[in-house]
Amino acid sequence: MDKILIRGARTHNLKNIDLTLPRDKLIVITGLSGSGKSSLAFDTLYAEGQRRYVESLSAYARQFLSMMEKPDVDTIEGLSPAISIEQKSTSHNPRSTVGTITEIYDYLRLLYARVGTPRCPDHDIPLEAQTISQMVDLVLERPEGSKLMLLAPVVRERKGEHLAVFDELRAQGFVRARVNGKLYELDELPKLDKQKKHSIDVVVDRFKVRADLQQRLAESFETALKLADGIALVAPMDDEQGEETIFSARFACPVCGHAISELEPKLFSFNNPAGACPTCDGLGVKQFFDTKRLVNTELTLAEGAIRGWDRRNVYYFQMLGSLAAHYGFSLEEPFGELSAEHQKVILQGSGKQSVDFKYLNDRGDIVKRSHPFEGIVPNLERRYRETESATVREELAKFLGTQPCPDCRGTRLRREARHVWVGEKTLPAVTNLPIGEASNYFGQLTLTGRRGEIAAKILKEICERLQFLVNVGLDYLTLDRSADTLSGGEAQRIRLASQIGAGLVGVMYILDEPSIGLHQRDNDRLLATLNHLRDLGNTVIVVEHDEDAIRLADYVVDIGPGAGVHGGQIVAEGSPQEVMDHPDSLTGKYLSGRKKIVVPAKRTPRNKKLQLKLKGARGNNLQNVDLEVPIGLLTCVTGVSGSGKSTLINNTLYPLAATALNGASSLEAAPHSSMDGLQHLDKVVDIDQSPIGRTPRSNPATYTGIFTPIRELFSGVPESRSRGYGPGRFSFNVKGGRCEACQGDGLIKVEMHFLPDIYVPCDVCKSKRYNRETLEIKYKGKNIHEVLEMTIEDAREFFDAVPALARKLQTLMDVGLSYIKLGQSATTLSGGEAQRVKLSRELSKRDTGKTLYILDEPTTGLHFADIQQLLDVLHRLRDHGNTVVVIEHNLDVIKTADWLVDLGPEGGSKGGQIIACGTPEELSEMKQSYTGHYLKPLLERDRA
């Protein structure tokens, strides 16, 4: 069967659609945000494909797999087993790295265990165990006739006269020994100074090199190795200064005896006690109480320079008072003006020195005690270590910072594992290379003999997997990069690379916007990868808005015509050209140029005197860059993937602004020199795509603050007042008005053991979340449940006479969310929808015109028409005098910005510089800018 037939799909907002898709093709599903693309791709096709495959397994196996809900569809024919690659961040486990997720690290561990050469950490000598035959062969390779002696080092740098050692050697029949580098007969030894360190090597054999010595040498080596615990020396007989050769029969340093057991893959795993650094347990970082977060240096101790140790906490404040009296400093002096010595005593303690403390007990008596002062930091460390309360830990964690582990310097591995070499690099050195460079290194690595044979297969796997990561535009990442620092787009492309590495055939892959976070330049490589996946013999279904991806597809499905209740229908399907020619397809209109996002006729000029100036930013790969952001304009930060955009804006500019303007104490900015210009602003808002809530109880009404006035309206109805109902009666989070059978969830979870848990509608309230008495209260003929079921569009009309509500509902409509329900569960909102709910909350606040808004890729999940709406909102914020900074790859957003900052020139270590600044027109003329290169034809086309 060469087709996938879908009949009667009604999942979520799909309106009983019938669809026939070709198999083994690249299919793009597009349409407005919220039109039903994910409902078709993930909740129907993927859910059914995965469910059928899992159902073919035994009941025992099924209990270990999470099964998806059966989609609401009549029939689907021609399905293959399905694999979905979504945008979710990979892992929040601090032990996950790019290397471990892609499994490249497992191959690297195997490579280093099987062909690695351990070296002594102190003397840099290879620790190689040799057999006696190998030792004999090496000696016989010397020029014939060479006079040599074989020595056994019996004492190494030890104090004493060592008389017992010499007696033992004489008893065994030895005649000569070398003491501190000089040869002596054992009967004519000098007296040794027992206060000094000495080295003694006994002469086991003296010989001239010739071919028939094999048997004699083997016996002599055996004797020497037995005497000196596996170590033997060969030195020239006549030349005391001559170079000697050290032989070892075990993995040990012949100089200091540093030994290592046989190399095993577990020695290179930081998730195994055998390989993890014992200081940081393989995490690479140590937590510490950061005094910068702990102390407000501008306040006095009495005012609360250290939270919890001010006047309000009598016990601790009495302690500080006694300490101040003992050391002679004032509690009324700003902490920053106290001497360094006094600051150290307060924070780190008085050591062993006792201090006289006076405490006022509950009865008003003064109690005197003399003891050392623990210090605020040790006090917090002890409380953090000993407490069993999660709340206390959470509170104290706000003051914790992290720093690289002092022992392993962030490499996570123990000392032995850090000193094993393959070629010219250790394992930490390889994992610290950008993937592109690591790929080149292993591609050129040549190992000879037995090692070469063993390594060949492992190297082939490593090189292939690294190349797949390069192909999806991730050549700038390093293998030791922590997984929780990856963006959604990066995480998805890593999964994509892993799937290509698996080389499966006949599978249905479903991807969710793989182009997120990719610069136009890297997009071509990604599309080639998707084609490669299709050419292997797979059906590749992509939910995508990217123009290039739609044009390249074999088959396009456009869902619409609107979003939410207005969507869920197939508007157009067929080749890209057929969709472009379709009169009703919104996507087709934008692709064919009948509709377009217009470039502003003129740019808002910048005022050079009003700028945010960030100097010397050095976080991650940033190379001491100076950033200037014009105040009151829409600035777009662009650059290829991995060039340092997020580090510059999210990790440096935002924490600095949030600390200065919002008083955030738990945010730490990446290294930089100075920040200027924040005095022109009054607050900063970071609008990201994280969920607005992680439980079904969170919804747009609660998040935007609409629900409170709605509950107040219901509590003000005469019937409510006569019954004594307050606003709390209409909350489904507290007892009173909610249905107690389902605790206000509307659903009841039923555990099904080896089948997926199912949520069944609550029998008591019929999914309405409230009890019967609460639902009897009506406002304008509707009860609270019916209001929550309204779409934003309907609610706007319904509450038209309530200005506070009408304004907030209007802003939700302005950001393109007219179709979502007021009470829609936050867990069902896409990333783009969650971001727009946050945007609307900001828009509905009273505007001071002095806010800095930061958005990271706000076009994720947005169709051309949605982008137009988003731009209208951003321009509206800008027109009110606010400063908007957007990190973006979408050329439609870039071309409408007032000012561009382009980072590059490449990603990773080859990036981290600001290579161009200016208006879109200026940037398009700059040869060094990749963004300008793609922007130029677009501006020319739009101006035409």
Swiss-Prot record:
One Gene Ontology cellular component annotation held by this UniProt entry: excinuclease repair complex
One Pfam match: UvrA_inter
Places the protein is found: Cytoplasm
CDD domains for this protein: ABC_UvrA_I, ABC_UvrA_II
Keyword Zinc: yes
Domain ABC transporter: 309-586, 606-936
Major place of residence: cytoplasm
GO molecular function ontology, one term from the record: zinc ion binding
PANTHER family, sorted: UVRABC SYSTEM PROTEIN A
The protein's role, per its UniProt record: The UvrABC repair system catalyzes the recognition and processing of DNA lesions. UvrA is an ATPase and a DNA-binding protein. A damage recognition complex composed of 2 UvrA and 2 UvrB subunits scans DNA for abnormalities. When the presence of a lesion has been verified by UvrB, the UvrA molecules dissociate.
Protein name: UvrABC system protein A
Organism in which the protein naturally occurs: Pseudomonas putida (strain ATCC 47054 / DSM 6125 / CFBP 8728 / NCIMB 11950 / KT2440)
